[in-house]
A protein has these predicted regions:
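N-terminal alpha/beta PP-like core and its mobile active-site loop of ThDP/TPP-dependent enzymes
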Residues: 1-223
Length: 223
């Protein structure tokens, strides 16, 4: 399509890393296309970072034509949905070519629904030649909304713990940045005058998680 910018990379690891950075910077799902099983394997090192960063990546991988998957012909990805696990939130190979548009739509919404994470979709090569099923255009109008809030009893217990604490500290994990809750973290720390720490091995930088300079130094906890 005219509004689709396709960027070719020399190695799947670099391509996944590029998409990861774009997804984190934009807050939108990034699309990555890998070369069958071998390309998926090459990209899984970078996919580890994407998983722990909660990056909304929609990863598609090529697959042999359907008639040749069972005989394990060259480039056949046997049991494709299992290959990227456990580094993806959802993985799938459509049972029929007509299910590909719906599966792509589900992949996009799943990657971008909290908690955000990479998803994986294996698509046989000959599926692209098949006609789309009737009504596929309605997928463009599909919207997914989610909402959640702590139970009032949980909030009351948390407030009591904070009020009773002698020297409370705030430890931030990567989801603070992934959910754009940075300002709320700053407000909470300032309200209770808490020092701020970053969880060990966090996949987000300290300045990204807690960007406001303050007297209480923001630094990572030692593992």
């Amino acid at each position: 399509p005219e509004d689709f910018q396709y960027i070719l990379g020399l190695h799947e690891g670099a391509v996944v890393g590029m998409a990861d950075g774009y997804a984190l910077a934009s807050g939108k799902p990034a699309f990555v296309n890998l070369h069958a099983a071998a390309g998926t394997g090459n990209g899984m090192g970078a996919l580890t970072n994407s998983w722990y960063s909660h990056s909304p990546l929609v990863i598609t991988a090529g697959q042999q034509v359907r008639s040749m998957i069972g005989v394990e012909a060259m480039l056949a990805n046997v049991d494709a949905p299992q290959l990227p696990k456990p580094l993806v939130k959802w993985s799938y190979e459509p049972a029929t070519a007509q299910d590909v548009p719906r599966a792509l739509s589900q992949a996009i919404h799943t990657a971008n629904t909290s908690p955000k994470a990479p998803v994986y979709l294996s698509i046989p090569y000959d599926d692209w030649e098949k006609p789309s099923p009737p009504g596929v255009e309605h997928l463009l109008d599909r919207h997914v909304h989610s909402a959640g809030a702590p139970d009032s009893r949980q909030l009351a217990a948390l407030v009591k713990q904070l009020n009773d604490a002698v020297n409370p500290v705030l430890v931030l994990g990567p989801e603070v940045d992934a959910t754009r809750a940075n300002d709320q973290a700053v407000a909470l720390a300032d309200r209770l005058k808490m020092p701020v720490w970053v969880a060990p091995f966090s996949m987000r930088a300290e300045t990204s998680l807690f960007p406001t300079p303050r007297s209480s130094t923001t630094k990572p906890l030692e593992a």
